[in-house]
């Protein structure tokens, strides 16, 4: 399956959300809780949403750090093989939901010092993000671009990564930590 087919399949083409089916799935995922406290009440997702209709197994990290996660710890081919192995294990353990691989890349890291602009964050170069996007294409994976905002603003960091966030398989993760 090529990337565009995977994205279309994952995102779905439904124009209307089947709320009864959604409610049933959410209740099942919450182990049919009878207290009424779980699952927490929340707005319905948009039609074609990935969650809760799929399980995502993601490998995390930053290519400049061996201590931040597996993306920087092991060579690409070994890491992708391990990720595909984990996806297969999860799919075998529970076939009720399709399992999707993902690469979760920390594209903006909080820093202990202010840096040139006193924002206490460091943006990774675009060529590193391009690398992750290309690796994801090889295995039809999702990409999560992780932003540790620090003293910057969500708006500034999102705008800096806008070209990636417009890609159909790229998603945003925000971490609002302050060193």
Predicted features along the sequence, with ranges:
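Alpha/beta catalytic barrel-like cores
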Residues: 1-125
